[in-house]
């Protein structure tokens, strides 16, 4: 209100479409969530003005995307297994499990023994260092789809060293705030997959730029969640329709975390783990 909107107003003559908003905000350091809030609203309004679904405006080629669930730290492996079973009943096929020291190898071994066929990911949220290489080499034996953010968010060089030791793909999340971050991580081999979060990178244009660069360099991406309301989730659905979003996404039913979402109809995941993207103009949902 005090800086970004006045900045945009002063530069309106340079804005021909929503992709130009990110260029106006490029001079602003960080403040990614605020920049994203403004830019994504403009994308929605513009898509409605040209009578297109947002996903088509972004260049998406999928009308449905696969969702997935992320499960936090549980007190025991049994509690984790029971939680996974409950989500499977609701249609979720891809399971991501949070890990940290003391809540890692025993838990993943138990989950893999109970569910030998599921798509299983682990997310460390920067809980480890390169000194934990023995643990990661053991996790390498459990057919994981990826290990997300094993080391600190600024440890790009150490991530590259770790990736060389593992067959399991490393996915970076907190380390990737911008196209420059993605470019550096890709160029030194610090990852094989990127988790793109629209709000964290400053909006849809930046998310698409990271997607495009990753695609050019053979690196797949998927869409992460910041526990958005339905409005944010709708933008996530739209960006996840792009071709190089190869993996199941942290996009889930509205009722997963909210008793009553602010959109209608609410987002629902099917029994096959897929979510259909609305064909209506803009984000495709009404505000309730």
Task: Kindly give the residue locations of the regions a language model identified.
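Predominant activation on well-ordered alpha-helical scaffold segments within soluble catalytic domains
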Residues: 5, 39-44, 109-112, 137, ...
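Structured core elements
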Residues: 96-98, 121, 146-148, 171, ...
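Generic detector of well-ordered alpha-helical packing
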Residues: 40, 45, 97, 124, ...
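N-terminal amphipathic alpha-helix/helix-capping segment at the start of soluble metabolic enzymes
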Residues: 48-64, 267-269, 275-278
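Metal-dependent enolase-superfamily TIM-barrel catalytic cores that perform enediolate-based chemistry
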Residues: 56-166
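Conserved, mostly hydrophobic/aromatic
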Residues: 38, 51, 95, 123, ...
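Metal- or metallocofactor-binding catalytic centers and their adjacent structured scaffolds
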Residues: 1-50
